[in-house]
Each structure stands twice: as C-alpha cells, then as structure tokens.
From Swiss-Prot:
Pfam families: LpxK. This is Tetraacyldisaccharide 4'-kinase. It is an enzyme of class 2 (transferase). SUPFAM superfamilies: P-loop containing nucleoside triphosphate hydrolases. GO terms for cellular component: plasma membrane. InterPro entries: LpxK, P-loop_NTPase.
Amino acid sequence: MNIAAVQKTCAPLLRPLGAAYAACMAARRAAYEAGVLPRFAPPRPVVSVGNICWGGTGKTPLVHWLLRWCGAHGLSAAVLARGYGAKPPQLPLLVRPGNTAAEAGDEPLMLARQNPDAAVLVDPVRRRAGHWAEAHLAPHLYLLDDGFQHLAVRRDLDIVVLRPVDLTGEWGRTIPAGSWREGTSALGRAHAFCVKAEPDLFNALGPQLERRLVRYGMPVFSFRLAPRGLVRVGRGLDPRPTEQGAATRAHLDGAPYVLVTGVGEPAQVHATATHFFGYPPLRHRIFPDHHPYGPGDVRQLAGEGCAVVCTPKDAVKLAPLCGEGAGHEGTNQPDLWAFDLVTEFGPALWSATSFPEWWAARWAGLSAARRV
C-alpha cells in the first residue's frame, strides 16, 4: 500500500484529523512543561537528536558523530534509545556488541558496536533508563536518540533533523494526513536544524528554508552520509574498518552489484550508492524499515551472483546470518559488503560557524552551566 497516495486521495478527510492530532500533541507538550506529567531531569546535560516526522532522517548517524566527538574529548556519554522492535532480556538493557538486533534493536546495536566505550541503553521508558544510568554510570552527557517527542526526559538542547520533503510537500502535514508527529509550532523548541541533503540540494532549498524556518531564529546546518569504502559483512568479522579483523575494500572496480536496504529512505541510499560507484545497482532489493532479515533473505542474496551492498544498519542484522566464509566461492553465502559511512557537514544558514564549531561552543556553555 502506498501510504502517501492514500493520504493525498483522502486529504480533505484527513486534514481535520491531522489538526486534531497536532492539538493533542500540543496539549501533551504543555502538560510536561507545566509539570503535570513527571520528567527525568538529571544533573548533567541532556541533548536530544530527533525529528518532526516518522521514519528515517539521519538521526542515528548524528548521534554516532556526537559519540565520537565525546570520545575524542574524554567525555562519557549515555544514549537513551527506544530500541524499535527490540525484545530486551531485561529493562533497561545496556547494549553490548555481543547482543543481537532482536534484543537491542538494529540502530542501538549499531551504535554500541561502532562506539564500544559509550553506554547505549534500550528501554521504551527512557525516564527509567535515565535513572538507571545516573545511578550506575553518571555520564558527562545524555543523548536522546529520536527524542524530540519523548518529553518525559528534560533536555538542554534539541537538535531537529529534517528531510528536504519536510520543507516542501510534507510541511505541516500531521498524522494521519501526513508524516509529521507534531504541528509546526513544535519546531519552536528546536535549538538547531539539520537537513540531510547534498550541498547542491541544500542550496536549492534556500527559498523554502527562508520561508519555513527563519521564523524560529535558529541555525540550519546541512549534512550527508558519505561512503569512504566498503567493509565485509559476515559472522565473526569486525564491522569497524579501522579494527583488526575487518576486511575492507575501496571500491568494486566497476563490477556489478545488488543493493539491499531495510531503512526509512531507500531512495537516498540508492542515490548514494550510484554516486559512490559511478553506476546504479543491477537491482535494489527494498525491505521495510527495521526489517528482521531471515535465512531465506540470505539465501536469495547468495543467489545474486555478484557483490551485495547494504547499509551499516542492515549489516548488524545480516552478519549473524552469514557464515565466517561469507563471500568465498562455494560457501553458498552472499558476497556481502556494507558502506563505511562518515557524516560530513556542508553549507549552513543563519550561522557563522560550521556544525562542529557550533556544537563545541554549545557544549562549552552547557558544561560550564552544569559544571561538568
């Protein structure tokens, strides 16, 4: 079912429902702000990375970037994540690299494996996870992954990630009329906006950015996920390209490949792959976001007869299903590779500094105020 097509066809009926939904979310927000509903308010800074819509926008890569920044500056961080679709053996779950995606969720597991020195906690009740982290870890900083609407945790900074379509056709279209979780007034809580877009697209969005976001008086940064190469995916292989045991390659040298994605924005991954390799995939196998891959999926991929490329988010679920001989002839295993992605920041609006410089300045202010 094409949800967007249904929403467009039924727009006259759905708009009033969307307005009612936005009003309910605004009332909920007011209840938290008035202290009617309880909030976890730790003594250390809390930074939320979230979005206004459902689905993938690039939140988790930004959380990963912040974790790497914290590690480089000698700061401990605790991520409070919901763990979409996860079934943790206990709550909260302190995610370890050895956990499975079924236990922790694909994105928390990816963060834990990419940042083994960070604490990634999964619990749908993030207030509970925060209390546990404060009692057992006392980190310098809390990061809320997908936290914009999770108001049960007080935050010092809200970084809101937007898609280009949020600035055009989806602007202000709340559920069920569109994909937004809240109305436009909610963006007034943001301290910065990050738009996942290539520099050329970000610059082309200038008129929409001016019309939509100037009223909030906050900086707007662009970013993209840029592949640096490929990392072999298989059981027992380290997913981090710089670590011992990781098999890497810079390119496919013009060989054909199949792209497989179980993410929120598969078209963006297709465009990234086409740009990186210089040619499109033979096929693009698109699965739903957070798809729980099974042995049947792996058998299909093994039958492709060429390299199969996926995202790091897909890799954490596919790796356990692939033997240690993955990719070797005669093993009946797919020749599976994942992109080694790096977050790159591009042009900005209403800011004299880049996002890393802006963040460093904001952290200096937060840490001084909280005496971190």
